[in-house]
């Protein structure tokens, strides 16, 4: 399972009825190969092992949430609720152990029984297996839904420096990322919104940087975000090594300059551990704003200088392959 996409390899979560059908049909085949009490014991062991193993596999296929990078853990919490997921996995783990205990109990009782009694015991065991699995039917469904949601999370590398590009819509964020990364960027969707995440990459002095545009999250005031989106913004604070905030002083973006600067100030408060670099884009049209840098993505003016500045604002020491250890 990848550290950059910890949920990508999660297997499909079986439903309760699928597990029971699989276990009982294979048990029937196993029983046909033998006769008398041996057939009943074979059916018991086959069904019990399949159910116990498959339920346990549901649990062990998931990564340890506490061992995840903070970005992935917080984003997962925003999407599915980590505490709820832990409880659901705990219930399925209980079911796995319960089936295993029932199998051992009925196996011991069968050994002391005749063939007819063994058949009755096997039927009792199957009924109790079904009761246990059906008790976690809702948990299995919830885990399956969580798996489907989390597999679509963006492939972000917490070990690579990340520059979050923020600002209101139409200020030139995507154009900037496309220009400095030669348009080699990826698009992924947040599962809890209709929003897409744009990620570009570039290398500088042996270091690979991620440039991340988050439309729908960091392009509007905090009060317009819902609870889940606020949690996602919180997750991004763990990821960002610098924030590049673009403003458009020309007014062409459709948003007042005061509103743009208010959003900048809000992000400064949220991302207080990293540098927030304010850049006026479309400087060929207007520079009527107090900014750290001025550039025009359209003409290319000062784009390289802005990129150098935001990279320089990142406190990152590369682990060079030729360094002495």
Which residue stretches match the model-derived regions?
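Switch I (effector-binding) loop of TRAFAC-class P-loop GTPase G-domains
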Residues: 156-158, 179-210, 214-234, 257
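Canonical P-loop GTPase G-domain recognition
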Residues: 273-277, 282-325
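Charged, amphipathic alpha-helical linker segments immediately N-terminal to NTP-binding catalytic cores
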Residues: 89-142, 312
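Pre-Walker A adenine-sensing motif
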Residues: 145-156
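P-loop (Walker A) phosphate-binding loop of NTP-binding proteins
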Residues: 166-169, 179
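Conserved lysine of the Walker
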Residues: 173
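Inter-motif core of Ras-like GTPase G domains
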Residues: 224-251, 262-271
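N-terminal accessory targeting/assembly segments
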Residues: 1-92
